[in-house]
Amino acid sequence: MAAPPQLQALLQAVNKLLRQRRYHAALAVIKGFRNGAVYGVKIRAPHALVMTFLFRSGSLREKLQAILKATYIHSRNLACFVFAYKSLHALQSHVQGETHQMHSFLAAFIGGLLLFGENNNINSQINMYLTSRVLYALCRLGVEKGYIPALKWDPFPLHTAVIWGLVLWLFEYHRPTLQPSLQSSMTYLYEDSNVWHDLSDFLIFNKSHPSK
C-alpha cells in the first residue's frame, strides 16, 4: 500500500533537507544525540540485567526498576555528551575558521565535566573503562612518536601477570579500594566458591535456598 501523497511529499522534503551540506554540522549533532542514546541502551541494558539478577537482592519489580534506571541514566548521559561534544567542537571550528586538535580535547573536557563529573557507580564504570584504553593508547602513541622505546619482545604476558596479581592482592587485602561491582564479581568467584552445604548449592545454585 502506497503512502499518502502528503506523507511522500513530506519525506522528500525532509530527505532533501538532510542532504544539504550547509546544515550538516547541526544535523550531525542531532544524529550524534540519537546514536549516543541507542548505544547507551545497547551497552548498559545487558550489563545491568546480568549484574542485577546475579548480585542484587529485592523483588522482581525492584530489579526491573533498577535495570531501567541504570539504562536510562547511561543512555541519557551518553546522548547528551555526544550532543555537547559535537556542538562545542563545531563551535570552536566555526569561530576559528579551522579545526585544531585542541578543539577535541576542550570539547570533550567540558562535556565530560558536565555529563560524567558526578561520582556515581555508572560514571565510575565508564571512566574506568576509558582509563584503561586511554593508557593503552597513550603508550602506543608514545612508541609511535619515539618517546617510548619499542620493545623487541611482547610485553603483554608480563602486563597480564602483573594486573592479575595486583587485582587479587587488592581483593584479598585491600578490598574497599576496588570498585563495588568488581568486588561483587570477585566475591562470587573467589569467596562464594568456598561455601556449600549439599549438591544443590555445590553445582546447581551458588547459595542454598532456605526451606519454607
From Swiss-Prot:
Spans traversing the lipid bilayer: 97-117, 153-173
Family membership: Belongs to the peroxisomal membrane protein PXMP2/4 family.
GO cellular component: peroxisomal membrane
PANTHER family registered for this protein in UniProt: PEROXISOMAL MEMBRANE PROTEIN 4
Designated name of the protein: Peroxisomal membrane protein 4
Residues with glycosylation annotation: 206
Topology of the protein relative to the lipid bilayer: Multi-pass membrane protein
UniProt keyword Glycoprotein, yes or no: yes
GO BP, one annotated term: ether lipid metabolic process
Matches recorded under Pfam families: Tim17 (PF02466)
Record's subcellular location: Peroxisome membrane
Keywords annotated in UniProt: Glycoprotein, Membrane, Peroxisome, Transmembrane, Transmembrane helix
Oligomer status and interactors: Interacts with PEX19.
